Amino acid sequence: MTFILTETSAGYAVLKAKDKKIYKSESILEELSTPELVTSQFKVKGFSKFDSAASALEEVNAIVDGRVSDKLAALLNEFKDEKKSALVVADPKLGNAINKLDLPFDVVAESASLDLFRAIRENLPSLLPGLTEKDLATMSLGLAHSLGRHKLKFSPDKVDTMIVQAIALLDDLDKELNTYAMRIKEWYGWHFPEMAKIVADNIAYARVIKTMGYRSNASETDLSEVLPEEVEAALKVAAEVSMGTEITEFDLENIQCLADQVIDFAEYREQLSNYLNARMAAIAPNLTALVGELVGARLIAHSGSLVNLAKAPASTVQILGAEKALFRALKTKHDTPKYGIIYHASLIGQASGKNKGKIARMLAAKASVSMRYDAFAEEREDVPILGIDNRIKVENRLRQLEGKEIVGTVRPDVNKIEHKKVDLSTGKQYNADADTVGNTTAGADSDDEDSDSEEEVKEKKAKKEKKEKKDKKEKKDKKDKKEKKDKKEKKEKKDKKRKREDDDDEPKKEKKSKK
């Protein structure tokens, strides 16, 4: 007897095959090509329905991990009396797990049986009369989404990609705003140059251009919604005596178009900043409470994701963003940087120059703990308690280093402190005799010191003379050795020369004797 275990999105099904060796057939697809052939070959012997979507997800996770759940074990126990039977399963890991249950099945998990399961899944509505094809498709889609979310641990509120893109766009907007604001000041400055010194804010400058237009309209224009009263008065006075040139209406239209761009960019930047704050509060509330939204977002963007940032040690978080300076310092063997992006946190900005490195190190350590809690905690509180506690600790450490009062410590009760009585009687008088020049003891001490110093000088002088004599003797010995060597070499040369001459004279003497 052959049973086939089939996992569906609705539950577990155990099918009984008419042909005992169907799983060994080489032409399964031909034998099971139509729903009629499938229904004639297989009959449902047992079905265990999933109670809910959550239980379906748990069961599927167990199958993926190769585990036998309680629900599946209960279904298989119904067939424990079936002896000399085979159970065909699709997953070899699940087959090994079923073998450990000591059931009277010969578990079969072969690649050849995949065609069998393909044919069964294509004709499930025919085998399970209570389920339609539409119902199975809907349940399969929902279960697939649930399984995907579970694997990715996906949560729409924790998508840190939004933070990476938002902080990058915020930086781009800042650059564009600065460029446009500088351009509009240079452009409108030809008409009203004094206005740049009076109205320092770029957005207010653009709003004034949009509201006022020509400088000649300043006295008649109400700028109370744009500027403070004293600035408005100064602007109107400067407009009366301005040294700027006149511009045409066409010029003013283009300048006002640029002013509209600056205002729109500023409004969108504010909206984007609020969005970034909300995202950071949802994704990394403890990190935000410790270092702020912008610094936290830049850290996440630099590392790529919150999980990557949480995996980094505190020392890496401390110098994140200063990699170029770090490698240059390592190459030149100079001091490595103490901080990177984290330098812009408000807590480090409050520290004095000598304490910035210490606070940066402590802040990085606390930030590392906070971001790990944000990244890996399954349940979190509405209030970022960990981040606030860590911030208080860093602030207290900063006050301690700066010599200020520490917040949160128990102060002593002033009433319980015992104060010593102050003696207001006459204190010890100054001894004027100690200043006299003729003090004998002082003179004796000074004589002893002088004698000691003279002995030291003599001793040093003797050592110096001894060393000089030794050096002279060594030099003389070297010189004598060199002279002896030179004499010896000269003598050897003379002997060789004389011998050569004697050798040359002998043939001449022989010739003379023959003659």
From Swiss-Prot:
Ranges in a coiled coil: none
Taxonomy, superkingdom: Eukaryota
UniProt main location, coarse: nucleus
Region (Disordered): 428-515
Gene Ontology molecular function: any one: snRNA binding
Cellular location(s): Nucleus, Nucleolus
Keyword Ribonucleoprotein set for record: yes
BP-aspect Gene Ontology terms: box C/D sno(s)RNA 3'-end processing; endonucleolytic cleavage in 5'-ETS of tricistronic rRNA transcript (SSU-rRNA, 5.8S rRNA, LSU-rRNA); endonucleolytic cleavage in ITS1 to separate SSU-rRNA from 5.8S rRNA and LSU-rRNA from tricistronic rRNA transcript (SSU-rRNA, 5.8S rRNA, LSU-rRNA); endonucleolytic cleavage to generate mature 5'-end of SSU-rRNA from (SSU-rRNA, 5.8S rRNA, LSU-rRNA); protein localization to nucleolus; snoRNA guided rRNA 2'-O-methylation
Pfam families listed in its UniProt record: Nop (PF01798), NOP5NT (PF08156)
InterPro entries: Nop56/Nop58, NOP58/56_N, Nop_C, Nop_dom, Nop_dom_sf, NOSIC
PANTHER family, per database record: NUCLEOLAR PROTEIN 5 NUCLEOLAR PROTEIN NOP5 NOP58, NUCLEOLAR PROTEIN 58
Family listed: Belongs to the NOP5/NOP56 family.
Reported function: Required for pre-18S rRNA processing. May bind microtubules.
Protein name as annotated: Nucleolar protein 58
Gene: NOP58
